[in-house]
Amino acid sequence: MPNIRIIAIFAVIVIAAVAGLAWPFISTMKFGYIMEPVQASQWHMGKGSEYTPEMTYQVTLNQTTFLADMKFLPVSQGAQQLLVKINPGGGASEIDQTVPIGLVYDFVDVSAPSKPYFDVLDQSVFSMRDYATEAKYLAKDAEWGDLYIGANAEKLKVTDSGKMSFKFGSADAYLLSYRIGAKMNKIWIVDNLPLPVKAEIYDPDGNLQYSYELGSLKAPSTPGLIS
């Protein structure tokens, strides 16, 4: 019995010593977002496009403001196209352009009249491709990616959710945000709609870089919408 007691005491001492040596390393480790909300829905660019919604945005970038009506056409032979109608305003004629939809929503083969507007859409509505070509969780505090602004690193994450009001109506939505200087940059997502429904993005000096909002939505087949 004395030998067993000595062995037990020695084992406790060894465990304590190992824990003491390991603690400085464990305590300095940075753990990421490892508890995935497995019950939450997920979203990616293009999710819900098969329901062929028609989404009309007001888009502003710098001094350019216009309306963009985007109709997701039915899938044909495994491919899908997007019909975009640009209304430049100011009495200018509407510009129509049909483009094939790819994974990253990068439309380079467009007509000369529509190119300036597609360049704006590329920097605004379609820019969500940088963070969500793969499925991301729609849950509070879920992280969607890292942003590097100058010497600072920020995380894009879900900061709010619930029923929210927009120009097109109300819907259960998810707010993603990150800070640049004194400004919070915000992007709103509605599950089963293939593009973000709203965004307000600022530059490091606090100036509005671009904004857009879904003003009209025709999506009778899209599940889960609340109007």
Residue ranges and their predicted role:
Residues 1-18, 24:
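N-terminal Sec-pathway targeting helices
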